[in-house]
């Protein structure tokens, strides 16, 4: 019986040890996989913040890529350390949890606040949701909220999350603020390509009035048509009406000699009849 209990305790101890190793935070091991965060990894080691972060069980690091962190990397070491501590949130947040925040503005506690040096809430951050985007800024009243959430780089619920933001957050009293980078220039839209198969309309013929209104020398000169010569002109074709007139003329010709003889004989008969009547 005692052997079974001791075996169970041994297994439980090993399980707890393994789970603690698996869940242990190692910010250096995470960031070294991403070359774009190499400068931040170096600054965390230089300011001796790496072992402090690794001792935490639940943490969110607001990471800055090499270009973004360049605006503070040349400042005094103590100032850089205080600024970086304000980029370590003592809670777990990834994209899902950030977007699920119901409040428009949420106050987050940072590693700088845990040092007891915070004044006027400069050890807190504001997480603000606006127009579908998420912004971070100092918790000091009136401080700008200009560090935009970009993406979740690494997540190990609910121990470590690395969230990339667009620019450093410098709280009042921790150093001079960082200027907001200008937005990228807007590219002009490309010109629409001409539609295929669209026929170009032919120019409309000009009216005579257009030529009349045109200044001298611009109106087109048209050569007058030369009258055809008599030799070149073809003979007129016979008209059908002329044929009818010729036929009518043929019908109206004087009577022939036979018809004249008939008339003379009739006249003699008439005269004979008249003479006989007078004789009686």
From Swiss-Prot:
It is found in: Cell membrane. It holds the Pfam family Fasciclin. Residues 180-193 have a biased composition (Pro residues). Keywords: Cell membrane, Glycoprotein, GPI-anchor, Lipoprotein, Membrane, Proteoglycan, Signal. Glycans are attached at residues 26, 126, 159. InterPro entries: FAS1_dom_sf, FAS1_domain, Plant_FLA. SUPFAM superfamilies: FAS1 domain. A lipid is attached at residue 256 (GPI-anchor amidated serine). Residues 1-24 form the signal peptide. It is a lipid-anchor; GPI-anchor. Residues 180-262 are annotated as: Disordered. Residues 25-169 form the FAS1 domain. GO terms for cellular component: plasma membrane; side of membrane. Its main location: membrane. Residues 219-234 have a biased composition (Low complexity). Residues 257-280 form a propeptide. PROSITE patterns: FAS1. May be a cell surface adhesion protein. Belongs to the fasciclin-like AGP family. PANTHER family: FASCICLIN-LIKE ARABINOGALACTAN PROTEIN, FASCICLIN-LIKE ARABINOGALACTAN PROTEIN 3. This is Fasciclin-like arabinogalactan protein 3. It comes from Arabidopsis thaliana.
